[in-house]
């Protein structure tokens, strides 16, 4: 299972998202200090009812908690766009 599949599986199980997009932007960071570790840079757009009435900072903490160990082993940087469904 590649990194995007790992992230997708965790986020789908944790948040039952209405929308989920995961973009690997690692190629944009080749040569940067953080890229030397081999970990990835990702952009995630996720929309879930579980975010309703939850401040943005708490939504991000929820995602970080769900991703858990992947933040140490596979993810160097992650940009989050957390929304509630329309």
Question: What do the PLM-derived regions correspond to, one by one?
Answer:
Residues 2-57, 69-86:
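Contiguous, often N-terminal, cationic amphipathic patches that form binding interfaces
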